[in-house]
């Protein structure tokens, strides 16, 4: 006799949807605060501060039954993935500006800090006796006993720091001099080049 395995295009898309489960949950949280302090009695001197925090949590559960076209013969395929990230930023600047006679000066002295952290994990298994509630009992698949299940997890963290100075001098609205200095450091830089 003769038979062939149908291409994906030969399958009913509605049936394909019914033979898989996709569950996703996401939580986002963010907050920021900015504050400015006028430093008296020095006129024109201000201290600015900004801080922000962002956090994200994401979970995805996926299951394709034994009748899903691409997983036929595998008795169902399940996977679970989790992701957690947060980002903290802080920036502080001291600003001074003043005008006297024909002279005008503006200066900024600043510091910036950022830290990003991420945690990631995933697991997959197949070979289930039933299609009910598989993503909540992923260890029930037979592939884990055969050493064929998959799992991984890792955590990463990166830090960025910067110091900067800007000075601008203007005389009589005709002559302008500007000087900027900046130094950056990051954990992403090479081992012997953390600052630049």
What are the roles of these predicted feature ranges?
Residues 1-15, 61-78, 119-150:
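Surface-exposed loop/turn segments flanking beta-strands in extracellular/periplasmic regions
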Residues 108, 171-172:
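Short, well-ordered loop/turn elements at secondary-structure boundaries
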């Amino acid at each position: 006799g003769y038979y062939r395995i149908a291409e994906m295009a030969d399958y009913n898309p509605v049936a394909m949807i019914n033979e898989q489960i996709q569950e996703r949950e996401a939580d986002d949280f963010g907050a920021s605060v900015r504050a400015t302090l006028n430093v008296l009695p020095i006129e024109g001197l201000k201290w600015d501060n900004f801080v922000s925090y962002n956090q994200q949590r994401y979970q995805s559960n996926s299951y394709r039954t034994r009748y899903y076209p691409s997983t036929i013969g595998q008795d169902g395929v399940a996977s679970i993935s989790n992701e957690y990230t947060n980002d903290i930023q802080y920036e502080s600047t001291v600003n001074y500006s003043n005008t006297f006679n024909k002279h005008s000066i503006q200066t900024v002295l600043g510091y910036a800090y950022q830290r990003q952290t991420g945690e990631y994990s995933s697991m997959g298994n197949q070979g289930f006796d039933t299609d009910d509630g598989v993503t909540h009992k992923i260890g029930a698949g037979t592939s884990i006993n055969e050493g064929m299940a998959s799992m991984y997890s890792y955590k990463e963290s990166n830090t960025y720091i910067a110091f900067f100075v800007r000075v601008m001098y203007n005389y009589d609205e005709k002559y302008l001099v500007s000087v900027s200095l900046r130094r950056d450091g990051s954990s992403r830089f090479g081992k012997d080049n953390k600052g630049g």
